[in-house]
Amino acid sequence: MIHAGNAITVQMLADGIAEFRFDLQGESVNKFNRATIEDFKAAIAAVKANNDIKGLVVTSGKSTFIVGADITEFGQNFAQGEKAIVDWLMPVHEIFNSFEDLDLPKVAAINGIALGGGFEMCLVCDYRVMSEAAQVGLPEIKLGIYPGFGGSVRLSRLIGIDNAVEWMAMATPKKPAAALKDGAVDAVVAADKLLDAATDLVKQAISGRLNWKAKRQEKLEAVKLNPLEQMMAFNTAKGAVLAKANPAQYPAPKLLLDSLQAGASLARDEALKAEAEGFAKAAVTPQAEALIGLFINDQVVKKASKQHEKGAHPVNQAAVLGAGIMGGGIAYQAASKGTPIIMKDIGNPQLALGMKEANNLLTKQVERKKMKPAQMGETLARIRPTLSYEEFKEVDIVIEAVTENPKVKEIVLAETEKNVRENTIIASNTSTISITRLAKALQRPENFVGMHFFNPVHMMPLVEVIRGEKTSEEAIATTVVLAQKMGKTPIVVNDCPGFLVNRVLFPYFGAFDLLVKDGADFQQIDNVMSKFGWPMGPAYLIDVVGIDTGVHGAEVMAEGFPDRMKPDYKGAIEAMYEAKRLGQKNDVGFYKYELDKKGKKAKTVDPTAYEVIAPFVTGEKREFDNQEIIDRMMLALCNETARCLEDNIVATASEADMAMIMGIGFPPFRGGPCRYIDQTGVAEYVALCDKYAHLGKAYEAPQMLRDMAANNKKFYG
């Protein structure tokens, strides 16, 4: 054994070829944490000291290659400021450079995922061979940063500026065919041929059949474009990238382009310094903190879901009650992920609607070449429409998705319970009605759980799994595991009106109503909140949700939280409802909707909307300060999020933030309501609440936040 470290071993194979093997002990994956980087340095020294080694094959002892840097170490490194980040990176560059500069050929045998720092490791090798099962890429932009271990410098020299920008800015892992086509890897082979293929390349390089020194030299020099070609390449790249990523919201792509441009005319070592300086600028942004936090929060949510796996019972057959758009969407989602599902309704027209919805969604998959026609047929065969309960004795879980009316739901749930086995779980897809309340209609409330899908089901990743007062842990566990099997991200919450997401969303709509009442133009509110980062403003959002749905939901919320969700005035949303303006459902709401050239509903300004709300505006019509609009909208939403934590509706800030991002489109680069409070500063946030407390209870800082401010605490760190 030439080197035996905690993360890397080096041992001789044959013919002067050694295996440089990454296998981080005590971990399921390889990653570049501090320990691995130190061991990397030691392993390089061991190779340098051994005169028998003529070439290296770089391998992994895990099912993945190297998944990247250790993101949990970023917070500590990034908190030190730009200079300290550069001072941290440059010694890492020296280690990677010393490996690249070894006077012998090196081939990476990429057996699985090689992302971020993992692929940057591959780039310091002279050749790269990829298994058919592997994926490679530099997705750091998703974290609000960009490649920091030399990836931007080496990839741009290897595959050209245009391709490199696309790889890094789009942040999409590349499959073997795409990586080979772009020239990022040199060969793709079957998994069982990987080591042989990599070893053969090393042999060819040692024998002189491959000019590995010339291939390496390309990465050590400036980009092979003259100044005019460089300017054209970067102008094209900037146009494409900045059209998709607003630098005010996502600064990393622009910083990446600036760094690439600064380093394009420089040799490797100077270009790496430019990369490090740009990386440091990105790393200290609040967006990087939020997006890295989001990645870590996603791991927290996945870990919480995994803990339910042991307590779940298998779901071999599911059923959905109600064959509307929602029921059809649920049936499609279950069937497309392999779970057979019975779809029941009270009439053939309703069943036809549900099957049409599933059929339309599957047809789109086929048209986009994401599914073969035969697979579509197999998926449709997993959905069995029925008018009776005859087959319900074989069902493991029933998802009720009938109209959002407590009396209707109670009747349907009680009837269903009589037609299923004693251990069958019944889940309600209610969006606001208390699970504990609905459970009173049942004989076996322990088998009853909330399973709240968001609309449209096939697109929205979140499922709220709601624990009622008497819901068993088995019911929770089974529902969580089914949601995961359906390709969704489940978050378990405790019962209350609106659960988590809608409980937080309705004060946001309430803040909108109050702003309009006070004289704000709803279009200004929409524009301000869109620029803030929401996918759409609140007026447009309520039009999309359905104004009737919003009004009915608001009634449930007002009953549950009268102190802050029951206004003593009639708002603009209710005015629209009374005027039978329901939003996109009937093409008139706050906006008017007409089909565009693509057949999608496009919004236009409708003067009638202003006439409808005019009688309910009591304030002087004026242009509000943008920051006041942001503060009033965000305080109402963030306060209710904090109250949900205070009331133990949701277990952690991580889950609360993820739910808001996945459920209502909270701007990801702001990290969620809890991260937003942290970044505002908890004491400063509480002071803002005090400033607007005269507007009502929704604006009063929850005691939890006052305590945190007094003790200098944050949600994160």
Curated annotation (Swiss-Prot):
One of the GO biological process terms: fatty acid beta-oxidation
InterPro entries: 3-OHacyl-CoA_DH_CS, 3-OHacyl-CoA_DH_NAD-bd, 3HC_DH_C, 6-PGluconate_DH-like_C_sf, ClpP/crotonase-like_dom_sf, Enoyl-CoA_hyd/isom_CS, Enoyl-CoA_hydra/iso, FA_oxidation_alpha_subunit
A Gene Ontology molecular function term of the record: delta(3)-delta(2)-enoyl-CoA isomerase activity
EC number: 4.2.1.17, 5.1.2.3, 5.3.3.8, 1.1.1.35
GO cellular component, one term: fatty acid beta-oxidation multienzyme complex
Keywords associated with the record: Fatty acid metabolism, Isomerase, Lipid degradation, Lipid metabolism, Lyase, Multifunctional enzyme, NAD, Oxidoreductase
Catalytic site: H452 (for 3-hydroxyacyl-coa dehydrogenase activity)
Classification via Gene3D superfamilies: 1.10.1040.50, 2-enoyl-CoA Hydratase, Chain A, domain 1, NAD(P)-binding Rossmann-like Domain
Quaternary organization: Heterotetramer of two alpha chains (FadB) and two beta chains (FadA).
Name the UniProt record assigns to this protein: Fatty acid oxidation complex subunit alpha
